[in-house]
Amino acid sequence: MEHMFPEREIENLFVKWIKKHIRNGNLTLFEEFFKTDPWIVNRCDKNGSSVFMWICIYGRIDFLKFLFEQESYPGEIINPHRRDKDGNSALHYLAEKKNHLILEEVLGYFGKNGTKICLPNFNGMTPVMKAAIRGRTSNVLSLIKFGADPTQKDYHRGFTAWDWAVFTGNMELVKSLNHDYQKPLYMHFPLYKLDVFHRWFKKKPKIIITGCKNNVYEKLPEQNPNFLCVKKLNKYGK
């Protein structure tokens, strides 16, 4: 008796197989499949991650350039807004990567077509927040340049990209935001946010703040390795 596989399972197995060749950098095979079925880039595995997402996750800029050459206009075939089961798009994954050039390539291409840069996932996390958490200063500035809103807040903690930069101790990013973008980015960072984070994640907060009003903070020599000591600065980071 023949074994019958659900269509969704077949789709998942196919994407897993393609994913393996993307990881190994087998562009020739991918080109052949693309010419047979261009919509292959939007096919998803069981987690909702599309082939285009996996190209971005693995940082295959050669695959990206090939795809962009095949379209008559940005978004003709590739759907950059497709999201996985957690609500993350390809931009969420690119924002976390160290390779800044891949993010610039995608933003420069889809930026012509007004791609939504601030699209949040199901927790309200936008790509610019993801980049701020990882400390990717270049990625944050690129996303803002293409229209991302660094003052947008996530759903659960009410953190902005600026709040995450302060919380994770990325003072280079904090200063860059306040120097380059004269928006109200020098928001308050109240102590209760640290208490909430401590209760939820059972971790010690990485930052000690003595004031709650509109302040920017810079890193000082640590007195305790478990904490980041800070001092008040003015709103321009000086």
Swiss-Prot record:
- Which GO biological process categories is it annotated with? regulation of gene expression; symbiont-mediated suppression of host NF-kappaB cascade
Pfam families per UniProt = Ank, Ank_2
Task: Mark the ANK repeats by their residue spans.
Answer: 48-77, 86-115, 123-152, 157-187
- Please outline how this chain is modified post-translation: The protein exists in a 28 kDa and a 32 kDa form, probably due to post-translational modifications which are neither phosphorylation, nor sumoylation.
Which keywords describe this protein according to UniProt? ANK repeat, Early protein, Host cytoplasm, Host nucleus, Host-virus interaction, Inhibition of host NF-kappa-B by virus, Repeat, Ubl conjugation
Residue numbers covered by motif PxIxITxC motif: 205-212
Question: Motif Nuclear localization signal: which ranges?
Answer: 80-86, 202-213
One cellular component term from this protein's GO annotations in UniProt: host cell cytoplasm
Q: Where in the cell is it found?
A: Host nucleus; Host cytoplasm
Recount the UniProt induction comment for this entry.
Answer: Expressed in the early phase of the viral replicative cycle.
Which family is annotated?
A: Belongs to the asfivirus A238L family.
The entry's free-text remark on domains says: The C-terminal region contains the docking motifs PxIxITxC and FLCV, which are required and sufficient for binding to host calcineurin.
Tell me, what does this protein do in biology? I-kappa-B- (IkB)-like protein that inhibits the binding of NF-kappa-B to DNA, thereby down-regulating pro-inflammatory cytokine production. Forms a heterodimer with the NF-kappa-B subunit RELA/p65 and prevents the activation of the NF-kappa-B transcription factor. Also inhibits the host calcineurin phosphatase activity, which is required for the induction of nuclear factor of activated T cells(NFAT)-dependent immune response genes. Inhibits calcineurin function, which is required for the induction of nuclear factor of activated T cells (NFAT)-dependent immune response genes.
Query: What is the name of this protein?
Result: IkB-like protein
Record organism = African swine fever virus (strain Badajoz 1971 Vero-adapted) (Ba71V)
Gene expressing this chain:
A238L
